[in-house]
């Protein structure tokens, strides 16, 4: 059993997790293309996934129902209105130039994950489409793109910053994995990318009332999480602070966030409401 609070050299880690779960639907979130792992590159791509002009997305009802199941399993509030947003940014593996996601009206809000020794609050869980996959190791001088993953339905589960140690974070991830596999909404296969995790981390004095500067660690796994406590102090206590760190020895990327909420609103990020009332 993990300790509820872990203070290291007078500092208290504060951790919030964003878990991306690929849902077990037959087709993608907004297109009729099949949702299946391991097929030949670009063999499961629809016109919608390619972002061609004139195509219109239709929401996958099965993905919506699976999101609702997760919300019920975590005693969360279920949205009565389905509203989606466009998150605009520029990646080679995102042909549309934006990702369809939920910002203002997520399908799930205010859930609870019970670890036995403490409860971790879920801020929200929202539906969004996955991006394609860029591969840089196939050819010496060129990168290639596989759009099979483009449009695959994701449920992004965002916790509140209630986690206070790496071992608590691992317990939380194991509990999320247990829930999604028991509900049969995802296979939770981390090696295939069915369950991916980003961590928002900071440190504070135990008697402080405000959190410290937040850093985001992308694409971590349980083995890295187990050593986060000591690495966290090394990263954040170094000075001066950097906006971006590439940590080659642990294979992840750290980005300091200087915005007041979960969503980055930098030069390449803006939001436009995208409404859908179709559940077919």
Indicate where each model-derived feature is located:
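Basic, nucleic-acid-interacting segments
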Residues: 2-262, 278-280
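Intrinsic low-complexity, disordered N-terminal segments enriched in polar/charged/small residues
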Residues: 273-277
């Amino acid at each position: 059993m993990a300790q509820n609070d872990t203070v290291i050299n007078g500092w208290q880690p504060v951790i919030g997790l964003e878990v991306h779960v690929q849902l077990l639907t037959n087709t993608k979130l907004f297109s009729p293309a099949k949702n299946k792992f391991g097929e030949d590159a670009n063999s499961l791509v629809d016109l919608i996934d390619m972002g061609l002009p004139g195509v219109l997305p239709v929401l996958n009802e099965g993905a919506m129902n699976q999101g609702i199941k997760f919300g019920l399993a975590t005693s969360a509030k279920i949205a009565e209105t389905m509203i989606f947003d466009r998150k605009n940014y520029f990646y080679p593996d995102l042909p549309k130039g934006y990702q369809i996601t939920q910002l203002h009206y997520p399908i799930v809000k205010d859930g609870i994950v019970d670890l036995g020794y403490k409860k971790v609050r879920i801020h929200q869980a929202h539906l969004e489409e996955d991006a394609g996959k860029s591969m840089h190791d196939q050819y010496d001088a060129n990168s290639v793109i596989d759009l099979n993953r483009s449009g695959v339905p994701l449920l992004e589960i965002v916790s509140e910053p209630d986690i206070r140690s790496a071992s608590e974070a691992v317990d939380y991830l194991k509990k999320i994995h247990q829930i999604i596999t028991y509900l049969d909404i995802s296979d939770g296969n981390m090696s295939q990318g069915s369950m991916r995790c980003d961590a928002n981390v900071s440190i504070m004095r135990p008697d402080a009332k405000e959190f410290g500067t937040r850093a985001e660690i992308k694409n971590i796994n349980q083995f890295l999480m187990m050593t986060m406590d000591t690495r966290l102090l090394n990263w954040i206590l170094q000075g001066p602070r950097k906006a971006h760190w590439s940590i080659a020895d642990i294979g992840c990327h750290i980005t300091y966030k200087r915005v007041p909420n979960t969503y980055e609103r930098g030069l390449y990020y803006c939001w436009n409401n995208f409404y859908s009332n179709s559940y077919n």
